[in-house]
């Protein structure tokens, strides 16, 4: 039998949180989005958080950090487990016990559903097998994901020269061109966050995507930096032209936020900033670097269509592909449904966006 502990409610940073973060960092499928500081960040912007976990012989063996908020015009209370739960999916008893804990947490919050998005790549198990596994444990497979299901992951274990060698020739050229054209890169501080926010606003308007409020980027930086996040700015003659905010958890780094100016684009500042972030992640000991989101299409379609498509994540695919990583996709999302009517309302509302 699995020895279980189940905790409801929120708590200040404590020994239990440190233990949880160590578990997430060491877990092969652990993610930044399951860390205590990610819960702290989201709790400042409309979410409430709750964690459930299991122990065997006094040791954490599984758990989930759940985010809750009202969605669909406030009609539906949603529970969301980003990049989780963290559990041994081959251990049916452990999975069932953990889902029972998740269900209890959801009931206590009045949630009509909980969406899970484990960070497990399709290379590990095909979609049909995975859907059958979801259903076996009472989950409804869902095409609706909150995090981008497809991404590009770089292997940071080789030497820097080999990492460069795996990039597209044009990307290597642009990294070197930035230096030749006088672009300098430095690690930013909290004082640089207003400049980074301005770049984010410019990028959002140019590329037609939503950006967070400036307070969000400040909170993210203050919670994670300097140990688990860094801000890199590419400048020309003292003017910030591009920025990258990179995060790390355990042996994985993630490129969550990036921005660039409309000025001096021929100097390739975005390439310089990205390379600095990759080098930081490698120096920190990360084995992988997640470029965090590309269009959800198979690689042959990505390669055939990226030059013509200019909507959604297509414009950034051209940039991200150049850094030479592997295109991977998660097994997708699934929903724990407690109220079928509310689940239909949520699904219909999501389909309108």
Language-model-detected regions and their locations in the chain:
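A short, internal acetyl-CoA/4′-phosphopantetheine-binding micro-motif in the GNAT/acyltransferase core
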Residues: 82-91, 157-158, 258-267, 295
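A conserved beta-strand-loop-helix scaffold within acyl/acetyltransferase catalytic domains
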Residues: 6-75, 118-126, 132-266
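Aromatic (often tryptophan-rich) hydrophobic motifs at membrane interfaces
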Residues: 96-105, 219-339
């Amino acid at each position: 039998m699995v020895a279980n502990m189940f905790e409801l409610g929120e708590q200040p940073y404590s020994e239990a949180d440190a233990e949880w973060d160590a578990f997430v960092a060491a877990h092969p499928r652990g993610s930044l989005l399951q860390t205590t500081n990610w819960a702290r960040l989201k709790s400042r912007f409309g979410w409430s958080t709750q964690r459930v976990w299991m122990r065997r012989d006094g040791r954490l063996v599984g758990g989930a950090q759940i985010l809750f908020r009202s969605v669909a015009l406030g009609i539906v209370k949603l529970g969301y487990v980003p990049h989780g739960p963290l559990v041994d999916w081959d251990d049916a008893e452990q999975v069932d016990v953990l889902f029972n804990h998740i269900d209890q947490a959801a009931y206590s919050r009045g949630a009509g559903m909980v969406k899970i998005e484990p960070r497990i790549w399709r290379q590990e198990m095909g979609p049909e097998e995975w859907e059958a596994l979801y259903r076996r444990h009472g989950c409804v497979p869902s095409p609706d994901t909150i995090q981008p299901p497809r991404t590009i992951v770089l292997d940071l274990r080789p030497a820097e020269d080999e990492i460069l060698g795996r990039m597209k020739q044009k990307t290597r050229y642009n990294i070197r061109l930035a230096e030749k054209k006088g672009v300098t890169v430095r690690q930013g501080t909290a004082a640089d966050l207003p400049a980074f926010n301005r770049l984010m606003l410019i990028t959002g308007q140019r590329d037609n995507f939503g950006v967070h409020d400036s307070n969000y980027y400040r909170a993210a930086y203050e919670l994670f930096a300097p140990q688990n996040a860094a801000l890199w700015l590419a400048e020309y003659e003292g003017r910030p032209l591009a920025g990258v905010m990179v995060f790390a958890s355990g042996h994985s780094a993630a490129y969550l936020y990036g921005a660039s100016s409309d000025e001096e684009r021929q100097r390739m500042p975005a390439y310089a900033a990205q390379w600095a972030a990759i080098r930081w992640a490698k120096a920190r000991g990360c084995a992988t670097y997640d470029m965090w989101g590309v269009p959800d299409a198979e690689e042959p379609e990505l390669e055939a269509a990226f030059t013509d498509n200019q909507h959604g994540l297509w414009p950034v695919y051209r940039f991200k592909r150049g850094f030479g990583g592997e295109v991977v996709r998660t097994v997708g999302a699934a929903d724990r449904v407690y109220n079928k009517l509310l689940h239909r309302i949520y699904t219909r509302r999501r389909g309108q966006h």
